[in-house]
């Protein structure tokens, strides 16, 4: 950059700082890069697939899927994990369907959980915004976007047409709260439902409610599906679940994770630790027997998982090794890609300059 441009830029930056305060504009290289803080989802496989060890703080996340696919269970699991680290959590229950007993079984400290059951969509989003601006809440769940009914629709008659009201409400609210969420370093999760588009001949007819604004403002979008049943004999005790990361602004998207949700217990975390431990060579498997560091921990996956439940220190040790191995490998791969892209850009710049 020539001297005239440098002086002009310095003058502009000085004027911006005087008018808007120090730090309104900054050079990226002047500040050390910091990793994005994350909150665990309660599923080890999903944390690893997300690339940063969980859902990013200071961002909006959307979780959507069919009925009974595990959306609320996954969000309650996020709350339970956040509370273990002393976080303050809130649940905006627009569906008026939160079961405190079930939440307690998943590990949620119900006594410390802030709960709101708003009457209208405007009230729900205003409460969410006020909680965010308090800078005192770490995780907010909104369940669900489909239940955020505009006041005009509630006060109107059955059968009245209210075209686009909910979409406009969501668009306005997200414009307002996105900046506050970043400043408060708060994770806001919107649960959403699926609807079918009529007359779609090609591509998926599925869409989510509430317009397109949430799709743009969300840093992470998770598509959760029930893929099968978990059985003990003839009794169904849980569901096989697959989560696909449809959008991810903090790591590569389109990864997926599979895990089991056990009814009344939540995500089968010890089962994931066994499976990932075997795949990473941390847990030895010989026939039906599982062993860790030469010591047998159980015959069959269920018994091995039961052993980890009875010995949480060993389970935590294996999980820590899995996280370090897979998350560091992912970070190293991303750094390598970034360095390669930078080198390619330098080569192109040199070629353009005639070197």
From Swiss-Prot:
Q: Name one GO biological process term.
A: SOS response
Kindly list the GO molecular function terms attached to this UniProt entry: ATP binding; ATP hydrolysis activity; ATP-dependent DNA damage sensor activity; damaged DNA binding; single-stranded DNA binding
Q: Which CDD domains match?
A: RecA
InterPro entries (UniProt xref): AAA+_ATPase, DNA_recomb/repair_RecA, DNA_recomb/repair_RecA_CS, P-loop_NTPase, RecA-like_C, RecA-like_N, RecA_ATP-bd, RecA_C_sf
Q: Keywords of this protein's UniProt record, alphabetized?
A: ATP-binding, Cytoplasm, DNA damage, DNA recombination, DNA repair, DNA-binding, Nucleotide-binding, SOS response
The entry's ATP-binding residues are 65-72
Give the UniProt subcellular location, in the record's own words.
Cytoplasm
Gene Ontology, cellular component aspect: cytosol
What does this chain do?
Can catalyze the hydrolysis of ATP in the presence of single-stranded DNA, the ATP-dependent uptake of single-stranded DNA by duplex DNA, and the ATP-dependent hybridization of homologous single-stranded DNAs. It interacts with LexA causing its activation and leading to its autocatalytic cleavage.
The similarity comment for this entry is: Belongs to the RecA family.
Query: What name does this protein carry?
Result: Protein RecA
């Amino acid at each position: 950059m020539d001297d005239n441009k440098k002086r002009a830029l310095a003058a502009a930056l000085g004027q911006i700082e005087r008018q808007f305060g120090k730090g309104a504009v900054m050079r990226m290289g002047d500040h050390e890069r910091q990793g994005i803080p994350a909150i665990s989802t309660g599923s080890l496989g999903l944390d690893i697939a997300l690339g940063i060890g969980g859902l990013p703080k200071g961002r909006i996340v959307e979780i959507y899927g069919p009925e009974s696919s595990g959306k609320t269970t996954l969000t309650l699991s996020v709350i339970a994990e956040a509370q273990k680290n002393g976080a303050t959590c809130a649940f905006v229950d627009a569906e008026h369907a939160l079961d405190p007993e079930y939440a307690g079984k998943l590990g949620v400290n119900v006594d410390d959980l802030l709960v709101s059951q708003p009457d209208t969509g405007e009230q729900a989003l205003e409460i969410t915004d006020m909680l965010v601006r308090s800078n005192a809440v770490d995780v907010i769940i909104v369940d669900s976007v489909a239940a955020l009914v505009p006041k005009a629709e509630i006060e109107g008659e059955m059968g009245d047409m209210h075209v686009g009201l909910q979409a406009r409400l969501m668009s306005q609210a997200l414009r307002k709260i996105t900046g506050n969420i970043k400043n408060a370093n708060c994770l806001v999760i919107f649960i959403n439902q699926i609807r079918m588009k009529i007359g779609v001949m090609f591509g998926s007819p599925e869409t989510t409610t509430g317009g397109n604004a949430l799709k743009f403002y969300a840093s992470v979008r998770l598509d959760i599906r029930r893929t099968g049943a978990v059985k003990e004999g003839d009794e169904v005790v849980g569901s096989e679940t697959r989560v696909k990361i449809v959008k991810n602004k903090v790591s590569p998207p389109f990864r997926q994770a599979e895990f089991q949700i056990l009814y009344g217990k939540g995500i089968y975390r010890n089962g994931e630790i066994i499976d990932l431990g075997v795949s990473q060579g941390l847990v030895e498997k010989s026939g039906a027997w599982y062993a860790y560091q030469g010591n047998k921990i159980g015959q069959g996956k269920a018994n091995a998982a039961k052993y980890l439940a009875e010995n949480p220190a060993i389970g935590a040790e294996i999980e820590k090794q899995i996280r370090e191995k897979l998350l560091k490998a992912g970070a190293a791969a991303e750094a390598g890609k970034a360095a390669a892209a930078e080198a390619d850009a330098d080569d192109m710049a040199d070629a353009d300059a005639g070197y």
